[in-house]
């Protein structure tokens, strides 16, 4: 069933949102298990036919030339109708100015268990050169970009993650350039980097990262397997740290992550400190300069991207963060679209049909496009009856059609949903102290009003140097 028929069916009441155990609403379960934690990716032929839908699959280069002329009413815009978004390839589009390099999956080349990799670090800024050896232990993720494996530093015994990607010798690696700028408790840390070569004269970039053993995706799966909801204190902790990290990335580093999802959120299950990882899709967004719209994994993709917007903003990360928060509350994705186009249907089923002004804010080229009128589904019916109203309110503020109406990351951090974290004697479920939450730097708070600063930093932490 195509998008227009599905939407008209919903609008006429023939299709309803079915109930799901544990929630008051209609959220269909995704058919695909997303257990390809953070790094799996599938290579599609640039032009092929999806046999199940007769839908042509096109590469981003094909769609990049799509006309900006709006389609006639009751006809899907070409950018939505004549292609399937490459939602399973979040890494295939990284570096559009790098000629859309799609490196193959690495086989071997230093990733075999027990193999030792030796490199030299230092030698800059007065630091002496130092030889460091790593023993590969196990592969923790693979994809079209390369491979990530866990390794042990033989000199110190420290566990690290090494992300190994094929490097085009003609270009600098954007991910490396961005990671060198970053230093934040909620962003995975780059230890150092080095290049390696193969017998085929292939050049590989190796990013040595701090190793964090768990992902938010797997942490949530732990609860859903037991038919339980994640404790609200953990939802608060994880969502807060996502927002704090995004504020740092957006305001201090000046980059948009463009692939926020549970698989790209690392978490220490003892301290519950969260760190955003995988900056292979990240980019500094420059106003007026176009960007690819085929970015971000499907369930977490902002609607302006589905509409083919190329001059989007950091607000796409806030939409993704809202989707992650809703998923933590529900135990399953809020918008489980089965294709790029179905993703829009899932959004409309809950948010209702976007107004002409909302469509203009997402992509001004499609203001004349007419959708069947579907009423918004009340947010309080999406979640179970005992859900804190503050949680529902924050989700609704993040999941706005209009990018400029979404909370900024710093505004989200100050939301009342996180007031429990600011209480003087709050602790983790295991009795431990909370991870550092309020040790903001001057750069993180730059431009924030006095009122906002007072909301962000609890009274018992102000002026005390208390970092938690």
UniProtKB/Swiss-Prot annotation:
Pfam families: Pkinase
Top-rank taxon: Eukaryota
EC number assigned by the record: 2.7.11.1
InterPro entries for the chain: GSK-3 (IPR050591), Kinase-like_dom_sf (IPR011009), Prot_kinase_dom (IPR000719), Protein_kinase_ATP_BS (IPR017441), Ser/Thr_kinase_AS (IPR008271), STKc_GSK3 (IPR039192)
Residue numbers carrying Phosphotyrosine: 294
Known catalytic reactions: L-seryl-[protein] + ATP = O-phospho-L-seryl-[protein] + ADP + H(+); L-threonyl-[protein] + ATP = O-phospho-L-threonyl-[protein] + ADP + H(+)
Binding positions (ATP): 140-148, 163
PANTHER family assigned to the protein according to its UniProt record, in alphabetical order: GLYCOGEN SYNTHASE KINASE-3 ALPHA, SHAGGY-RELATED PROTEIN KINASE THETA
Protein name: Shaggy-related protein kinase theta
